Amino acid sequence: MLDIKFLRTNFEEVKAKLQHRGEDLTDFGRFEELDTRRRELLVQTEELKSKRNEVSQQISVLKREKKDAESLILEMREVGEKVKDLDNELRTVEEDLERLMLSIPNIPHESAPVGETEDDNVVARTWGEVKEFAFEPKPHWDLATDLGILDFERAGKVTGSRFVFYKGAGARLERALISFMLDLHTDEHGYEEVLPPYMVNRASMTGTGQLPKFEEDAFRIESEDYFLIPTAEVPVTNMHRDEILNKEQLPIRYAAFSSCFRSEAGSAGRDTRGLIRQHQFNKVELVKFVKPEDSYEELEKLXNDAERVLQLLELPYRVMSMCTGDLGFTAAKKYDIEVWIPSYGTYREISSCSNFEAFQARRANIRFRREPNGKPEHVHTLNGSGLAIGRTVAAILENYQQEDGTIIIPEVLRPYMGGKTVIK
């Protein structure tokens, strides 16, 4: 959520920056109308309440003196009705303004490339050499099915499309990656491990920006009005909702493993085979709470921490600086890390690393004090995948495949695989 005072005094500047996102700003223009009416109603209500208090004192004096106060009493009844009507209108206007503020996306950072679509994203850097195969490489779903380590067909029978059973060495590989990533981020990168709830309430989904705009993308448990988490970012960020932190606590860095659940409502017909786009998948998420002046340095570190996973796995990748039209709703600046997938003949996203500045913290009311009695300020929040496990499995299967259909296990994972070197 944007700062309403900043928006009020910089309306045209904010509007121009949001236009770089390619957003529909039809409702945005209502801000000035609603904000002005809200302030008018506040003034009118306070004036009437002040008058009511004054006249109430006059009525008390008249009654003590046993004088006629009927005319003033009638006047106060009218004032009371007016106050009631104004309060009702004010409540409606404030609800409309709140809904509008929750629907306005974050302002892009000045360093984000200006553009409209993913075609305008900029390659920031690449790492590793794309492997040239002496044979036609197979897609990971064929490799895994032939090896008996993934079962999409039975998962479809048990649940439906976009689900999978991991079996044998496939399940062990998934578990190995989770442990490897958590060990790396906690032991070497300084994150604290968190195992979060997989269900959250509506306030949590609103705090991180999934609601109200993207409710159709979420799995909701209607009986409780809970949501299955689309990412550990939601519960972990909301750990500190409605809290005031001390500056000495910052930066806070969490690494959280969780399963993630997404309806993929807008992805019909895309990536229908394999692990790239599942309704349920595992992920290690990195979440940070930092002082505002440190957030862009922390964004660079966040991306480096996520990249380190791919470097140790020796998987070629590139880092994309996302343009203003492809930032998503909540980010001020975002890097996508994309790993090479041979069967696609291109790079595919395996991590998004974002700086939300105070956007989420304002929605979730997460603040800190620089001094013990100082005025609370909003923290800046960041998060990034470190990494998406299923897509990492897909990248390993395809990049490490041999002509006979076996898979060489990356050296760094072998201690987690019981010393095994090959999946066959």
Curated annotation (Swiss-Prot):
Organism: Bacillus cereus (strain ATCC 10987 / NRS 248)
Keyword Metal-binding found: no
UniProt pathway: Aminoacyl-tRNA biosynthesis; selenocysteinyl-tRNA(Sec) biosynthesis; L-seryl-tRNA(Sec) from L-serine and tRNA(Sec): step 1/1
Name of the encoding gene: serS
Quaternary structure (record): Homodimer. The tRNA molecule binds across the dimer.
HAMAP family: Ser_tRNA_synth_type1
One BP annotation, GO: selenocysteine biosynthetic process
EC number: 6.1.1.11
Places the protein is found: Cytoplasm
List of residues binding L-serine: 231-233, 285, 385
Transmembrane segments: none
Family designation: Belongs to the class-II aminoacyl-tRNA synthetase family. Type-1 seryl-tRNA synthetase subfamily.
Role: Catalyzes the attachment of serine to tRNA(Ser). Is also able to aminoacylate tRNA(Sec) with serine, to form the misacylated tRNA L-seryl-tRNA(Sec), which will be further converted into selenocysteinyl-tRNA(Sec).
Description of its domains: Consists of two distinct domains, a catalytic core and a N-terminal extension that is involved in tRNA binding.
A single Gene Ontology CC term: cytoplasm
Recorded catalytic activity of this chain's protein: tRNA(Ser) + L-serine + ATP = L-seryl-tRNA(Ser) + AMP + diphosphate + H(+); tRNA(Sec) + L-serine + ATP = L-seryl-tRNA(Sec) + AMP + diphosphate + H(+)
Pfam families xref list: Seryl_tRNA_N (PF02403), tRNA-synt_2b (PF00587)
Protein name stated in the entry: Serine--tRNA ligase
Keyword annotations: Aminoacyl-tRNA synthetase, ATP-binding, Cytoplasm, Ligase, Nucleotide-binding, Protein biosynthesis
GO molecular function, one term: serine-tRNA ligase activity
Residues bound to ATP: 262-264, 349-352
Major localization listed first in the record, in broad terms: cytoplasm
Superkingdom of this protein's organism: Bacteria
